[in-house]
Amino acid sequence: MAAYSYRPGPGGGPGPAAGAALPDQSFLWNVFQRVDKDRSGVISDNELQQALSNGTWTPFNPVTVRSIISMFDRENKAGVNFSEFTGVWKYITDWQNVFRTYDRDNSGMIDKNELKQALSGFGYRLSDQFHDILIRKFDRQGRGQIAFDDFIQGCIVLQRLTDIFRRYDTDQDGWIQVSYEQYLSMVFSIV
Protein backbone atom coordinates (compact mmCIF):
# COMPACT_ATOMS: atom_id res chain seq x y z
CA MET A 1 0.00 0.00 0.00
CA ALA A 2 2.86 2.34 -0.70
CA ALA A 3 0.65 4.20 -3.17
CA TYR A 4 -0.67 6.54 -0.51
CA SER A 5 1.88 9.06 0.56
CA TYR A 6 0.66 11.33 3.32
CA ARG A 7 0.22 14.91 2.28
CA PRO A 8 -0.22 17.44 5.05
CA GLY A 9 -3.58 19.08 5.04
CA PRO A 10 -4.29 22.72 4.43
CA GLY A 11 -2.18 25.05 6.51
CA GLY A 12 0.40 22.29 6.84
CA GLY A 13 -1.81 20.91 9.56
CA PRO A 14 -3.96 17.85 9.80
CA GLY A 15 -6.22 18.18 6.75
CA PRO A 16 -7.61 14.79 5.96
CA ALA A 17 -7.05 12.50 8.90
CA ALA A 18 -4.58 9.82 7.95
CA GLY A 19 -6.10 7.32 10.36
CA ALA A 20 -8.80 5.57 8.32
CA ALA A 21 -7.80 2.13 7.12
CA LEU A 22 -8.12 1.10 3.49
CA PRO A 23 -10.67 -1.54 2.55
CA ASP A 24 -9.20 -4.87 1.52
CA GLN A 25 -7.41 -5.11 -1.81
CA SER A 26 -10.07 -7.31 -3.46
CA PHE A 27 -12.76 -4.71 -2.72
CA LEU A 28 -10.60 -1.92 -4.14
CA TRP A 29 -9.70 -4.05 -7.18
CA ASN A 30 -13.42 -4.58 -7.90
CA VAL A 31 -14.06 -0.84 -7.59
CA PHE A 32 -11.06 -0.10 -9.81
CA GLN A 33 -12.33 -2.48 -12.51
CA ARG A 34 -15.82 -0.94 -12.44
CA VAL A 35 -14.40 2.59 -12.78
CA ASP A 36 -11.87 1.64 -15.50
CA LYS A 37 -14.55 1.57 -18.22
CA ASP A 38 -12.15 1.18 -21.15
CA ARG A 39 -10.21 -1.63 -19.40
CA SER A 40 -6.90 0.17 -20.02
CA GLY A 41 -5.56 -0.51 -16.53
CA VAL A 42 -5.53 3.24 -15.91
CA ILE A 43 -8.40 5.35 -14.58
CA SER A 44 -8.58 8.63 -16.48
CA ASP A 45 -9.91 11.88 -15.08
CA ASN A 46 -13.14 11.39 -17.05
CA GLU A 47 -13.62 7.87 -15.68
CA LEU A 48 -12.95 9.04 -12.14
CA GLN A 49 -15.27 12.04 -12.51
CA GLN A 50 -18.12 9.77 -13.66
CA ALA A 51 -17.57 7.47 -10.69
CA LEU A 52 -17.49 10.18 -8.02
CA SER A 53 -20.47 11.77 -6.32
CA ASN A 54 -20.48 15.12 -4.60
CA GLY A 55 -23.96 14.66 -3.14
CA THR A 56 -25.56 17.43 -5.20
CA TRP A 57 -26.61 15.55 -8.34
CA THR A 58 -24.14 17.64 -10.33
CA PRO A 59 -20.99 16.29 -11.94
CA PHE A 60 -17.93 16.19 -9.70
CA ASN A 61 -15.78 19.26 -10.34
CA PRO A 62 -13.42 18.32 -13.22
CA VAL A 63 -10.73 20.65 -11.87
CA THR A 64 -10.81 18.79 -8.54
CA VAL A 65 -10.59 15.44 -10.32
CA ARG A 66 -7.59 16.58 -12.38
CA SER A 67 -5.89 17.94 -9.24
CA ILE A 68 -6.36 14.63 -7.42
CA ILE A 69 -5.17 12.58 -10.40
CA SER A 70 -2.07 14.76 -10.76
CA MET A 71 -1.18 14.25 -7.08
CA PHE A 72 -1.11 10.47 -7.46
CA ASP A 73 -0.10 9.93 -11.12
CA ARG A 74 3.60 9.22 -10.60
CA GLU A 75 4.25 8.32 -14.25
CA ASN A 76 2.49 11.30 -15.90
CA LYS A 77 0.11 9.05 -17.83
CA ALA A 78 -2.97 11.27 -17.27
CA GLY A 79 -4.53 8.71 -14.99
CA VAL A 80 -3.91 6.36 -12.10
CA ASN A 81 -3.12 2.65 -12.11
CA PHE A 82 -4.43 0.33 -9.41
CA SER A 83 -1.58 0.99 -6.99
CA GLU A 84 -2.08 4.75 -7.32
CA PHE A 85 -5.85 4.34 -7.13
CA THR A 86 -5.54 2.98 -3.60
CA GLY A 87 -3.98 6.33 -2.66
CA VAL A 88 -6.75 8.22 -4.45
CA TRP A 89 -9.36 6.14 -2.60
CA LYS A 90 -7.79 6.91 0.77
CA TYR A 91 -7.33 10.60 -0.05
CA ILE A 92 -10.98 11.03 -1.04
CA THR A 93 -12.21 8.97 1.91
CA ASP A 94 -10.12 11.07 4.29
CA TRP A 95 -11.55 14.26 2.78
CA GLN A 96 -15.08 12.84 3.14
CA ASN A 97 -14.42 12.34 6.84
CA VAL A 98 -13.14 15.90 7.21
CA PHE A 99 -16.11 17.25 5.26
CA ARG A 100 -18.59 15.34 7.41
CA THR A 101 -16.87 16.56 10.56
CA TYR A 102 -17.36 20.21 9.60
CA ASP A 103 -20.77 19.83 7.90
CA ARG A 104 -22.35 20.27 11.32
CA ASP A 105 -25.93 20.55 10.06
CA ASN A 106 -25.53 17.45 7.81
CA SER A 107 -26.76 19.42 4.81
CA GLY A 108 -24.18 17.91 2.47
CA MET A 109 -22.79 21.41 1.98
CA ILE A 110 -20.30 23.59 3.85
CA ASP A 111 -21.59 27.07 4.69
CA LYS A 112 -19.47 30.06 5.66
CA ASN A 113 -19.46 29.30 9.39
CA GLU A 114 -18.60 25.64 8.78
CA LEU A 115 -15.83 26.71 6.40
CA LYS A 116 -14.44 29.06 9.06
CA GLN A 117 -14.43 26.18 11.55
CA ALA A 118 -12.70 23.85 9.08
CA LEU A 119 -10.01 26.31 8.05
CA SER A 120 -9.44 27.33 11.65
CA GLY A 121 -9.04 23.63 12.48
CA PHE A 122 -6.40 23.42 9.74
CA GLY A 123 -4.49 26.32 11.31
CA TYR A 124 -5.64 29.20 9.10
CA ARG A 125 -6.58 32.54 10.65
CA LEU A 126 -8.49 34.43 7.97
CA SER A 127 -10.98 37.30 8.04
CA ASP A 128 -14.72 37.06 7.42
CA GLN A 129 -14.16 38.99 4.21
CA PHE A 130 -11.74 36.35 2.95
CA HIS A 131 -14.11 33.52 3.88
CA ASP A 132 -16.70 35.33 1.71
CA ILE A 133 -14.20 35.34 -1.17
CA LEU A 134 -13.64 31.60 -0.77
CA ILE A 135 -17.38 30.90 -0.73
CA ARG A 136 -17.91 32.99 -3.89
CA LYS A 137 -14.96 31.34 -5.64
CA PHE A 138 -15.84 27.72 -4.86
CA ASP A 139 -19.66 27.84 -4.75
CA ARG A 140 -20.45 26.57 -8.26
CA GLN A 141 -24.19 26.46 -7.54
CA GLY A 142 -24.54 30.04 -6.30
CA ARG A 143 -26.18 29.05 -3.00
CA GLY A 144 -23.66 30.49 -0.55
CA GLN A 145 -22.41 27.00 0.27
CA ILE A 146 -19.66 24.71 -0.98
CA ALA A 147 -20.23 21.11 -2.11
CA PHE A 148 -17.83 18.31 -1.19
CA ASP A 149 -15.80 18.38 -4.42
CA ASP A 150 -15.46 22.16 -4.35
CA PHE A 151 -14.42 22.02 -0.69
CA ILE A 152 -11.57 19.69 -1.65
CA GLN A 153 -10.59 21.99 -4.52
CA GLY A 154 -10.68 25.07 -2.30
CA CYS A 155 -8.46 23.39 0.27
CA ILE A 156 -6.02 22.19 -2.40
CA VAL A 157 -5.76 25.67 -3.91
CA LEU A 158 -5.40 27.34 -0.53
CA GLN A 159 -2.64 24.89 0.43
CA ARG A 160 -0.76 25.45 -2.83
CA LEU A 161 -0.99 29.23 -2.47
CA THR A 162 0.12 28.98 1.14
CA ASP A 163 3.13 26.90 0.13
CA ILE A 164 4.10 29.50 -2.49
CA PHE A 165 3.60 32.33 -0.03
CA ARG A 166 5.77 30.61 2.59
CA ARG A 167 8.64 30.32 0.12
CA TYR A 168 8.75 34.11 -0.15
CA ASP A 169 7.95 34.87 3.48
CA THR A 170 11.51 34.16 4.56
CA ASP A 171 11.18 35.78 7.98
CA GLN A 172 7.85 33.99 8.50
CA ASP A 173 6.05 37.11 9.58
CA GLY A 174 3.03 36.69 7.27
CA TRP A 175 4.11 39.49 4.95
CA ILE A 176 5.92 39.67 1.65
CA GLN A 177 5.32 42.85 -0.35
CA VAL A 178 1.58 42.67 0.31
CA SER A 179 -0.31 41.02 3.12
CA TYR A 180 -1.15 37.34 2.86
CA GLU A 181 -4.86 38.03 2.38
CA GLN A 182 -4.22 40.71 -0.24
CA TYR A 183 -2.03 38.22 -2.08
CA LEU A 184 -4.64 35.47 -1.86
CA SER A 185 -7.41 37.86 -2.86
CA MET A 186 -5.44 38.92 -5.93
CA VAL A 187 -4.64 35.34 -6.90
CA PHE A 188 -8.19 34.08 -6.33
CA SER A 189 -9.55 36.90 -8.45
CA ILE A 190 -7.56 35.67 -11.46
CA VAL A 191 -7.57 31.89 -10.92
Curated annotation (Swiss-Prot):
Disruption phenotype: No visible phenotype. Mice develop normally and display no obvious immune defect. T-cells retain susceptibility to apoptotic stimuli. Residues 23-58, 59-89, 90-125, 126-161, 162-191 form the EF-hand domain. It is found in: Endoplasmic reticulum membrane; Cytoplasmic vesicle, COPII-coated vesicle membrane; Cytoplasm; Nucleus. InterPro entries: EF-hand-dom_pair (IPR011992), EF_Hand_1_Ca_BS (IPR018247), EF_hand_dom (IPR002048), Peflin/Sorcin_CaBP (IPR051426). Ca(2+) 1 binds at D36, D38, S40, V42, E47. One of its GO terms (molecular function) is magnesium ion binding. Ca(2+) 2 binds at D103, D105, S107, M109, E114. Keywords: Acetylation, Angiogenesis, Apoptosis, Calcium, Cytoplasm, Cytoplasmic vesicle, Endoplasmic reticulum, Endosome, Magnesium, Membrane, Metal-binding, Nucleus, Repeat. PROSITE patterns: EF_HAND_1, EF_HAND_2. It holds the Pfam family EF-hand_7. GO terms for cellular component: COPII vesicle coat; Cul3-RING ubiquitin ligase complex; cytoplasm; cytosol; endoplasmic reticulum exit site; endoplasmic reticulum membrane; endosome; nucleoplasm. It is a peripheral membrane protein. Disulfide bonds: none annotated. Mg(2+) binds at D169, D171, D173, W175. One of its GO terms (biological process) is positive regulation of endothelial cell migration. The modification N-acetylalanine is found at A2. Homodimer and heterodimer; heterodimerizes (via the EF-hand 5) with PEF1. Isoform 1 and isoform 2 self-associate; probably forming homodimers. Interacts with CPNE4 (via VWFA domain). Interacts with PDCD6IP; the interaction is calcium-dependent. Interacts with RBM22. Interacts with PLSCR4. Interacts with ANXA7 and TSG101. Interacts with DAPK1. Interacts with SEC31A; the interaction is calcium-dependent and promotes monoubiquitination of SEC31A. Interacts with ANXA11 (via N-terminus); the interaction is calcium-dependent. Interacts with different set of proteins thanks to 3 different hydrophobic pockets. Hydrophobic pockets 1 and 2, which mediate interaction with PDCD6IP, are largely formed by residues from EF-hand 3 (EF3) to 5 (EF5), as well as by Tyr-180 (EF5) of a dimerizing molecule (Pocket 1) and from EF-hand (EF2) to 4 (EF4) (Pocket 2). Hydrophobic pocket 3, which mediates interaction with SEC31A, is mainly formed by residues from EF-hand 1 (EF1) to 3 (EF3). EF-hand 1 (EF1) and 3 (EF3) are the high-affinity calcium-binding sites, while EF-hand 5 (EF5) binds calcium with low-affinity. A one-residue insertion in the EF5-binding loop prevents the glutamyl residue at the C-terminal end of the loop from serving as the canonical bidentate calcium ligand. EF5 acts as a high-affinity magnesium-binding domain instead. Magnesium, may affect dimerization. EF5 may bind either calcium or magnesium depending on the context. Calcium sensor that plays a key role in processes such as endoplasmic reticulum (ER)-Golgi vesicular transport, endosomal biogenesis or membrane repair. Acts as an adapter that bridges unrelated proteins or stabilizes weak protein-protein complexes in response to calcium: calcium-binding triggers exposure of apolar surface, promoting interaction with different sets of proteins thanks to 3 different hydrophobic pockets, leading to translocation to membranes. This is Programmed cell death protein 6. The gene is Pdcd6.
